[in-house]
C-alpha cells in the first residue's frame, strides 16, 4: 500500500491514530514514521497497542528502545485500574481478568509516564505498566499492553470500553496553537526612561 496508508492527506484528516503492529516494524519507512511523529506533535492522538511498543513512531516519540520482557505461555493477566478517576478508566471495574494472554514483564524501557492508568499482574509472577499516557507537543499518547493476535482480547467489552475511552481522551482539543519562533514586536509596549541625569558622583 502506498505510504503504508499514511499519506499526508490521510494523516491531516486523522484525529486519533490507533496502531497495532507485530514483527514487521522495520518495514515501515523512516519518512512515514517521522510523518506520524510530526502529526502527533501537531496534535493528533496516538494509541499504541500491544507489541506496537516497538513501532518506529512510538520509539521516536519516547526516545528510548521501548523493549521489555515477554513470554507466550497462555497465562492469566489481571489488569488493575490504579487511577479510577482518569478518563480512560471511565465505566470500568476495579480490575479486568483475561484468562489467557501473552506475558510481558518489567523492566519496560520507556520514559516515566505522565500518567499511569493500569498495571498488569500475570499468573507467572510478572507485573507490567500496561496503560501509560504521555503528552508530546500538542498530542496525547496512550500505550495499552493487551492484544496478542492469538487471543480474543479485543472482543472483551471492558477492553473495548478502554479503547473508546482512550480515543475520547486522546482526540485533539482544537484550541489555539502556540506561536513559536522569533517574535519581533512585543505584545506590550516597552517604554524606556532615561534616568542618567539623576545620578551624580
Which role does the model predict for each range below?
Residues 1-8:
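A short, well-structured beta->alpha microelement
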Residues 128, 136-201:
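Extracellular ligand-binding/catalytic regions of CAZymes and related secreted enzymes
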Residues 26-92:
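A glycine-rich, often tryptophan-bearing local segment used as a flexible ligand/cofactor-contacting loop or short
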Residues 12, 60, 68-143, 194-200:
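Catalytic beta-strand/loop cores that center a nucleophilic Ser/Cys/Thr
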Residues 33-37, 131, 163:
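Short amphipathic alpha-helical segments and helix-helix/interface helices
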Residues 10-18:
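Short acidic/histidine-rich motifs immediately flanking catalytic phosphotransfer sites
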Residues 4, 23-26, 52-56, 95, ...:
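Solvent-exposed loop/turn segments at secondary-structure junctions
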Amino acid at each position: 500500500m502506498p505510504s503504508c496508508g499514511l499519506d499526508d492527506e490521510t494523516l491531516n484528516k486523522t484525529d486519533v491514530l490507533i496502531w497495532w503492529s507485530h514483527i514487521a516494524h522495520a518495514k515501515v519507512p523512516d519518512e512515514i514514521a517521522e510523518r506520524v511523529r510530526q502529526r502527533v506533535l501537531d496534535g493528533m492522538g496516538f494509541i499504541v497497542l500491544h507489541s506496537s511498543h516497538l513501532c518506529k513512531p512510538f520509539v521516536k516519540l519516547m526516545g528510548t528502545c521501548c523493549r521489555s520482557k515477554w513470554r507466550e505461555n497462555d497465562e492469566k493477566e489481571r489488569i488493575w485500574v490504579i487511577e479510577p478517576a482518569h478518563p480512560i478508566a471511565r465505566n470500568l471495574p476495579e480490575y479486568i481478568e483475561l484468562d489467557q494472554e501473552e506475558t510481558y514483564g518489567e523492566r519496560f524501557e520507556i520514559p516515566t509516564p505522565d500518567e499511569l492508568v493500569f498495571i498488569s499482574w500475570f499468573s507467572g509472577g510478572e507485573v507490567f505498566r500496561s496503560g501509560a499516557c504521555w503528552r508530546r507537543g500538542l498530542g496525547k499518547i496512550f500505550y495499552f499492553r493487551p492484544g496478542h493476535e492469538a487471543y480474543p482480547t479485543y472482543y472483551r467489552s471492558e477492553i473495548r470500553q478502554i479503547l473508546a475511552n482512550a480515543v475520547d481522551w486522546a482526540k485533539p482539543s482544537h484550541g489555539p496553537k502556540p506561536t513559536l519562533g522569533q517574535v519581533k514586536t512585543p505584545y506590550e509596549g516597552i517604554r524606556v526612561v532615561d534616568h542618567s541625569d539623576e545620578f551624580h558622583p
